[in-house]
């Protein structure tokens, strides 16, 4: 009966999409001619400090400052609509961050962090780009996702109910296509970062980050570096390093949206 119910639900969704095809085509055309919507998500905030560096640097402060710098660079040329999930020292629950991206019909969601992770005796170091996956790519990714997913608990926020099995199946179908765009952007971003800043070994990793679970918005989580490493902390508070990092991320975003922006005034060239 469960299988029949899932099949029936899928059929209804397919019929609904087909009935709405002309409207969907119109909306798709309108969106193609609109400015891409980018949501930048500075991690943590408010009561949730995030990581604290060996020299006392607060993750919640450094990622907010960097997000504002990246926003300003992306604003040049007027190519995008850019939103921050927070622009001050405010705590935003993980589910609400995801919902912000969905409500804004974002074309790209970038969560920005600078965590503290220790693997045995080796301190993680270097920028890392994470995408969503059901199974973590490695122990570090698993540890980091578990830490990030505790954010709401730290702030005393009640965890949201998990979706029903049927709903989860249907959402997973939608996530698969979105995930391919997320991976494509992650690879594009790493391609730009590798000539600008130090990257961790195997810089594209994946795990079950709650903040990346929007089924309809390509999403990545960028670790600028690791505050548990004194060398990374020094870079993270360096204005010159932040400029290089933001410039590389800006170019990656331009590359990602270049096909859509081709021919428009102010569009970036190859």
Which residues does each predicted region cover?
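Catalytic-core regions of hydrolytic enzymes
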Residues: 3-166, 175-187, 243, 247, ...
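Active-site-adjacent mobile loop/cap segments within catalytic or ligand-binding domains
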Residues: 118, 170-270
């Amino acid at each position: 009966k469960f299988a029949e119910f899932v099949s029936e639900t899928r059929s209804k969704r397919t019929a609904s999409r087909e009935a709405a095809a002309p409207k969907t085509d119109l909306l798709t055309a309108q969106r193609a001619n609109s400015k891409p919507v980018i949501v930048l998500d500075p991690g943590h905030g408010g009561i949730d400090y995030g990581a604290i560096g060996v020299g006392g640097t607060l993750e919640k402060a450094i990622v907010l400052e960097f997000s504002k710098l990246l926003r300003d660079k992306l604003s040049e040329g007027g190519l995008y609509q850019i939103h921050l999930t927070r622009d001050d020292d405010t705590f935003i629950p993980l589910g609400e961050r995801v919902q912000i991206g969905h409500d804004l019909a974002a074309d790209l969601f970038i969560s920005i962090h600078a965590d503290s992770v220790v693997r045995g005796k080796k301190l993680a170091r270097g920028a890392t780009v994470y995408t969503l996956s059901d199974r973590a790519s490695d122990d570090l990714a698993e540890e980091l996702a578990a830490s990030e997913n505790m954010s709401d608990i730290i702030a005393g926020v009640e965890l949201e109910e998990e979706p029903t099995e049927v709903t989860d199946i249907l959402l997973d179908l939608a996530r698969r296509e979105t995930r391919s765009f997320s991976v494509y952007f992650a690879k594009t971003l790493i391609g730009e970062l590798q000539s600008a800043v130090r990257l961790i070994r195997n810089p594209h990793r994946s795990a079950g980050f709650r903040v990346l679970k929007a089924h309809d918005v390509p999403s990545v989580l960028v670790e600028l570096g690791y505050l548990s490493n004194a060398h990374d902390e020094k870079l993270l508070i360096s204005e010159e390093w932040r400029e290089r990092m933001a410039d590389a991320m800006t170019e990656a975003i331009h590359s990602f949206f270049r096909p859509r922006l081709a021919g428009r005034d102010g569009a970036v060239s190859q």
